[in-house]
């Protein structure tokens, strides 16, 4: 039996050679637990005549990954095999790889079709010796197997469907793409990215330095006008943004309701549902970034709109397909008055924006005055109990996980962009709160800090966090100026207001590394101090930029220009960790370069790349299933696996018990200190999760993607959660509602083939807003 080598030559299969290759990659691993011979034997079983060495490496990596539940070092070995395989298939020098990407010729038409931009190529050519010399390829081996496979699938650039970039090449491309001729800053960014202190968002990793360098994650639009022209002009904007891998939030509260008169044609409106069907089909049609992500939009509606009940049914699993839009996400932009009416079991008037104009343009007391005026004038379409609408909201959430909930008054009252006008919607992932109108499309560029990295020698390094945040601010601020904008209205908005969004990932990992239970007082205190530090560092960096370049165009009249910062709007006094008054004085003197700074996003894909838990979320399970080409296998929370292995507590009995309990360790006989630290999201009171969101909210000037997890949701549980979040002043009341599937049938065996832990889908989830 023979294998085909990379150079095309045939060679007889040699077991010893396969074993030797695997053994070479076991350096530094625990040799008491890692068995290269076992991996090699399984590889031999999968060999067929004419198999390539690339396929052998791929198989060996997958086999090693399947052994991860035996010891965490197998995950490292799997990644090393996969990375080593890529290194053998790609050129080493960064400059040569960039040259190949620039010189790409489309084989279909013979035209020069550069994948990277000419300016990127010029910079690389001028500084190639320096850039080539600072890249440290060993850092590629720091990715875990699934992080590396995520990079391979969507992030590393390809020529004719063959990957040509290594992870380090990608990171240097991103750094050069952002900083261009400022090589020292590019190298600083490269090192921080490659050491995993932070990551830029997926669109930045995809597109920085390329011919179409669209690096922004989020776009917020208002419907231009309640007319055929306005609706279809807005649709075109959405299509052009979606084409360039942007996630969309769209407010439609100004579109007339069904049954309303249309003066131009003397007809009757069909309302928002047929219109949204058109938007849904556009989302389905547009394929973003060459299959990197399908088109996605979140549609925002205020609950006074007469079509609200039909809107809440849009994602239901049953009913007339003509009234469903399964490819759009739905979200509610809820005024406080609605919550008060629900609380008091009052009446709620449903209105048409054509007959009751201006409701979407006002908030707070002004909204209440206008709404009650229309009620007194009997301009409403109908009156129902507020709780009837509320019940429909809850039922939709229990069935579909949506609509998302955002509080209109909190979003406007506590926004540093309040001086621009009324904010009418958020984005696809509910963390961006920015002003948009018919002439401006709001944009946000994102990045996320890997909080686990700042746990150094058993303590959290706040000073290092502040320093890294300041680099991120400078990077995101540069992206605003060099970005490729899909539509001019987006460029106008972004350059006028210059908002950015800094988020986090690995909060749960940081708590675990410090041995803090997620719901402990220590974790709650650290949660506040982390976000206080991020906000402080971001403000300091933005003020320093304003000192050099001037404040953003619409700074005058903002809260910050009057010495009011986000925590003031929450009536919160910061800790004594940072000296706020001198910073406020400096901001009064120089202003800020950016109107908004902090926005914790979901980080779905980038957290997977860096091997961290998502965003600010606790772990959802301590064991789950991964799907790969060779089948399914179990992955255990790496922190838990390591601590149990070190304490000689890990065995098949414990593994099967955790699998039988759906990823929980609370019913095992493990020590109580471990059980407390490794509670899953289902075992942590949601009230604590919401309270921690409010605690950090005082230092988040945009908002945060906050999921609610309730294993067995009910009307009363969800209502209680929503009203608690609203009472605490949250801007985002809920991103998704996550529930547990119905209980599995009684399990008669603990055999791993019979027990199915939760499956984690390996597809891209909200890559656009993934920081």
Curated annotation (Swiss-Prot):
Cofactor dependence: Mg(2+)
Residues that bind GDP: 202, 217, 427, 431, 603-606
Catalytic activity, as annotated: a 2'-deoxyribonucleoside 5'-diphosphate + [thioredoxin]-disulfide + H2O = a ribonucleoside 5'-diphosphate + [thioredoxin]-dithiol
Residues of the ATP-cone domain: 1-92
GO function terms (MF aspect): ATP binding; ribonucleoside-diphosphate reductase activity, thioredoxin disulfide as acceptor
Keyword Oxidoreductase attributed: yes
Metal-binding in keyword set: no
Role summary: Ribonucleoside-diphosphate reductase holoenzyme provides the precursors necessary for viral DNA synthesis. Allows virus growth in non-dividing cells. Catalyzes the biosynthesis of deoxyribonucleotides from the corresponding ribonucleotides.
Full protein name: Ribonucleoside-diphosphate reductase large subunit
